[in-house]
Every structure is written in structure tokens, then in C-alpha cells.
């Protein structure tokens, strides 16, 4: 969707490009968006160099194998996304309508009031036991989006993800 949208709106995307003021001025652009990306931060924890310790890039992009009991360090947006990825095996329910409806208890036969009254959610069992760790004392995921944070927290709770705050490392 986004690639197509960029094409149809004639947005020029330049990846892995060093720029300076002169090159930006010479480019004659109407608008400039600098998206510098992000690199995983490696915490100073004894044992972090162990082969069992993976960055989110190792897990998501390189698809390195992940064990059955996983601690995710950091409960921001990336930590939540990685945790969501880890509890699913194969195709995520967000990519399969019938599985999504079943997981969230949505009545597709239009018999339940509002489509949900009296319908029990039936999430599939998590693929792994996941612990989502946060140093802050606030509620885990408190910094997520106001309109979507609740759904991310609920989805992980439904998969028995243990969300721990006030963690020291």
C-alpha cells in the first residue's frame, strides 16, 4: 500500500543517502523529510554477547530462531511489536480475517448485539512464553498511542505475555 501510494503521489525516496545543506538546496525540493531510522541499543548487561541474545533486527529481519521462553527488554513500540511477533506462529491473526474475528470474539453471523455481546474471544495459544520488561515504574505500554495502546496491551495480555515494570538491568 505505502509503496504504491509513494508512486502515485510522485514521492522520491532516497535511501542510504548522505545529505548536506547544499545538496538539499540544489535539489529544489518542495518538502524534505529526514527519516534517519533507528539502530538497536545494546544495553550494558553481562552476557549480552551470548548467542542466545538477539536484537529485534535479528528476530524480525534476519528471522533467527528464537527459543520458547523469551525476555523482551524495552516496552516501547518496538518491544510491543516484537512481543506480538513472538507470540504468533506462522501467519498473524491480523492477516487472516476468520482468525482475527475468532481471536477478538466478533460475531460474523450478526446474531450478537453489537457484534460482540455474549461472544467469547478465543485467542489461539501463544507460540512462546514472553516476558516484556520495562525499567519505568509506570504501567507497561503507558507511552503507546492514546487510541491504540489499549489494543496492543490487551492483545498481549490475551496471549499471556507477562508485562513487568520497575525492572533493573
Region spans (language model):
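Local beta-strand N-terminus motif with an aromatic residue
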Residues: 6, 29-30
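Rossmann-like dinucleotide/flavin-binding elements
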Residues: 14-28, 36-45, 49, 56-144, ...
Amino acid at each position: 500500500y505505502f509503496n504504491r501510494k509513494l508512486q502515485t503521489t510522485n514521492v522520491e525516496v532516497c535511501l542510504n543517502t548522505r545529505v548536506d545543506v547544499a545538496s538539499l538546496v540544489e535539489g529544489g525540493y518542495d518538502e524534505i523529510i529526514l527519516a534517519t531510522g533507528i539502530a538497536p541499543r545494546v544495553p550494558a548487561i553481562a552476557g549480552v554477547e551470548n548467542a542466545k541474545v538477539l536484537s529485534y533486527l535479528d528476530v524480525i529481519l534476519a528471522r533467527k530462531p528464537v527459543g520458547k521462553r523469551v525476555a523482551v527488554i524495552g516496552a516501547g513500540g518496538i518491544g510491543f511489536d516484537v512481543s506480538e511477533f513472538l507470540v504468533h506462529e506462522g501467519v498473524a491473526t491480523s492477516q487472516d480475517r476468520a482468525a482475527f474475528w475468532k481471536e477478538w470474539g466478533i460475531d460474523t453471523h450478526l446474531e450478537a448485539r453489537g457484534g460482540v455481546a455474549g461472544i467469547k474471544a478465543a485467542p489461539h495459544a501463544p507460540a512462546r512464553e514472553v516476558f516484556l520488561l520495562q525499567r519505568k515504574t509506570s504501567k507497561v505500554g503507558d507511552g503507546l498511542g492514546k487510541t491504540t495502546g489499549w489494543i496492543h496491551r490487551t492483545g498481549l495480555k490475551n496471549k499471556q505475555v507477562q508485562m513487568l515494570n520497575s525492572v533493573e538491568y
